[in-house]
A protein has these predicted regions:
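Active-site nucleophile and cofactor-binding loops and adjacent substrate-binding regions
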Residues: 94-103, 120-129, 202-208, 234-239, ...
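Small/polar-residue-rich loop-to-helix segments that shape phosphate-bearing ligand pockets
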Residues: 145-229, 265, 271-318, 324
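Positively charged, low-complexity intrinsically disordered leader regions
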Residues: 1-119
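Alpha-helix C-terminal capping segments
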Residues: 108-117, 131-143, 248-254, 348-358
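Buried hydrophobic positions in well-ordered alpha/beta secondary-structure cores of metabolic enzymes
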Residues: 65, 90, 102, 127, ...
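Active-site/ligand-binding loops adjacent to catalytic centers
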Residues: 63, 185-193, 252-338, 380-468
Length: 470
């Protein structure tokens, strides 16, 4: 019997396809209402933290160096009030085999795929995760397919995504490059069904749990090196897995560090817009992913996402494109380190936040990534100019995404801007209710939403009262 391969036909089979491609029956975690058993789902990986460390270390993933940025710290202190200016550190995740922290996510997923007998892995990603999956698959002797959203309707590709395709292909993956739009998820599902490969999604428990080793390492390294945990850890935020995994690892280490999410401000640019696709100079760690995925994590390519950042986030800040480009140059010229845009998003935020903190405190940027070719600032700026973006020096707060990139004319103008956390939390609650409009909200649902938002049952009740649902 021929299967219905129309868009609606494939979408009607998505849960079955996902179950076969991941080996997880997500239905067993459901309550039948709003809540589900998140911790039970995370335990579905079947691996302890120690086992995950062993898996990662066996392929050269993890144990990345911690570097103190003394010169950037000194610069921030010159701009800060007397006695302020925390010490700035980075966890150099670019030292992983594929050049980013996502090797940690991929190592677990690929190991599990091979253990279950899958012949290959597939991932839908335009970013560093594709290179990470390709790298780990090559080491494991598995086939690898990466599906990218790369081009606009005119066939013009974003330089950073094209560079990542190059890297994936260099590591042995087959890369399918698609234009912006809903076809990506459709193609992803058809490939999973046709090949029988493992879904190495960013958002499975395997992938998110893999980042727990990063958070755990951070706590152990700083206790040994400085005699205490970091005071603040800044995580570049897009889909939320980076922050979720890091925070869970810190919790397992017993750390009490403040967790700050940082994203590039792309307000006004729609990520699924063909005309706006090439108006941005950042393809990850931006608000176009960060805000939607924070306020409704289950919009991903699995039934229930393991990345649930609002459970762990204490603060959410944004920085502008010009500020990240500036700090990228500053890192290279002052510290002798040339790194890519994702980690430098968090670094721009950390540079600003450090000036609020005492000199004896520690702030850590928990990732770096490789740079080069299309990821480098020069081709990104050339591409922006070709797309009509006004590039100049001035006050970055005057920057309009899709129209201008404004470098700070003085480093004192780099300012992380806080986003209202309660607004995010209320948005998540509203989105959860919208998914289950006919459900009578139970006490367990209230407790679930309190955990989802890192608040209290009283906060959830107040938010529900605001939308006339209680």
């Amino acid at each position: 019997m021929n299967k219905d391969m129309t868009y609606s036909g494939v979408m009607s089979r998505k849960n079955e396809i996902m179950k076969n491609a991941i080996g997880i029956d997500y239905g067993i975690f459901e309550s039948g209402t709003i809540g589900f058993d998140y911790e039970k789902m995370m335990r579905e990986t079947g691996y302890t933290l120690e086992e995950m460390q062993k898996i990662q270390y066996s392929t050269g993933v993890g144990k990345t160096p911690v570097l103190e940025l003394r010169n950037l710290t000194e610069l921030s202190r010159k701009l800060a009030p007397k006695g302020k200016g925390a010490r700035i550190f980075i966890k150099d995740e670019a030292a992983n085999p594929s050049g980013s922290f996502k090797a940690r996510r991929a190592a677990n997923a690929v190991y599990h795929a091979k253990k279950l007998g899958y012949k290959g892995v597939i991932a839908a990603t335009s970013g560093n995760y594709g290179a990470a999956v390709a790298s780990q698959a090559a080491m494991a002797g598995l086939k690898c397919i990466i599906v990218q959203e790369c081009y606009d309707s005119k066939g013009v590709g974003q330089p950073e995504i094209i560079e990542k395709a190059r890297k994936c292909e260099a590591l042995g993956a087959e890369v399918l490059q698609l234009s912006v739009g809903p076809e990506l998820f459709y193609k992803f599902l058809t490939l999973l069904e046709e090949t029988g490969y493992f879904n190495a999604s960013l958002y499975t428990p395997f992938g998110i749990a893999g980042v727990e080793t990063l958070g755990y390492e951070l706590a152990m390294e700083f206790r040994e090196r400085e005699g205490k945990d970091p005071d603040v850890i800044v995580c570049s935020n897009a889909g939320g897995g980076n922050l979720t995994g890091t925070a869970r690892g810190l919790i397992k280490a017993g750390a009490q560090s403040q967790i700050v999410a940082a994203s590039v401000n792309l307000k006004g640019l729609h990520m699924a817009s063909d005309s706006q696709f090439n108006k941005k100079s950042f393809t990850t760690s931006h608000t176009g992913f960060g805000m939607p995925f924070a306020t409704w994590p289950d919009r991903s390519d699995v039934p229930r996402s393991a990345a649930r950042p609002l459970r762990y986030m204490d603060r959410y800040v944004t920085v502008n494109q010009g500020e990240v480009f500036y700090i990228t140059e500053a890192l290279a010229s002052l510290e002798g380190l040339e790194k890519g845009p994702a980690g430098n998003t968090a670094l721009a935020a950390a540079f600003s936040i450090a000036q609020e903190m005492d000199e004896n405190e520690i702030i850590v940027v928990q990732e770096t990534e490789y740079t080069g070719a299309g990821k480098h600032i020069q081709p990104q700026l050339s591409f922006a100019r070709d797309n009509g973006i006004d590039i100049r020096f001035g006050n970055p707060q005057d920057e309009i995404p899709g129209e201008s990139i404004i470098f700070p004319e003085h480093p004192s103008l780099i300012k992380a801007v806080d986003f209202d956390m309660d607004k995010l939390r209320k948005s998540l609650i509203k989105n959860a209710i919208a998914q289950f409009p006919d459900v009578v909200i139970s006490d367990s649902d209230l407790e679930f939403l309190a955990k989802e938002t890192k608040t209290s049952v009283e906060f959830v009740k107040s938010a529900l009262d605001g939308i006339n649902k209680i």
